[in-house]
A protein has these predicted regions:
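Extended beta-strand-rich architecture
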Residues: 3-175
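N-terminal low-complexity segments that are often proline-rich with Ser/Thr-Pro
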Residues: 177-179
Length: 179
């Protein structure tokens, strides 16, 4: 955790319950785990990854004037196996946006890029688990030219990428209707 904070990341904690719409957008086609008695439609399924909470926090902060964001979350996700047995997995996820540094009176700094995100992920991995390769990613909500699966020692340990412009537009439109 301290390594992420030393890179300027702020930790968030989001609900493990998300909307079906968020699951359909970010759930990577995984089976939903419906809540028997949800508090609201926005909390009707258990999350299968942490992306929804990060993106919703990002949009909230963006609407309140925060362009430059570095967020991370460590949280539990929930899955069902073919036998309908439920299991829980702890994951870590992060998000960066805006400029590399805050602008000052003298100069404007460059926007963060895919490579800044890749560097942040690489810094988080231990020396024994450095990224061994990146392979093209086919996750629907990510931009196809700016996304990759992360492999450490031939094991897929995650993904990184930029949100697809169509997904981002959909999120902004949905968020505007909700507020």
């Amino acid at each position: 955790m301290y390594k992420r904070q030393s890179q300027g990341f702020n930790e968030i904690v989001s609900y493990a319950f998300i909307s079906k719409e968020d699951h359909n957008l970010f759930g990577q086609k995984q089976k939903t785990l419906d809540v028997a008695n949800p508090l609201s439609q926005n909390m009707s399924v258990m999350r299968t990854n942490l992306v929804s909470g990060l993106v919703n926090t990002f949009l909230y902060n963006l609407n309140h004037g925060q362009q430059n964001q570095r967020l991370f979350e460590i949280g539990n996700t929930f899955f069902t196996k073919k036998s309908n047995e439920v299991f829980e997995q702890k994951l870590v996820a992060g998000l960066i946006s805006g400029r590399k540094q805050s602008d000052n009176w003298k100069e404007k700094y460059a926007e963060v890029t895919f490579y800044d995100l890749k560097g942040a992920v690489q810094d988080l991995l231990t020396d024994s688990n450095k990224i061994s390769s990146l392979q093209n990613c086919d996750i629907d909500f990510l931009h196809p030219g700016m996304s990759s699966y992360i492999f450490c020692k031939k094991e897929n340990v995650g993904f990184l990428g930029s949100i697809h412009p169509v997904s981002y537009t959909h999120l902004r439109a949905h968020e505007t209707k909700a507020n």
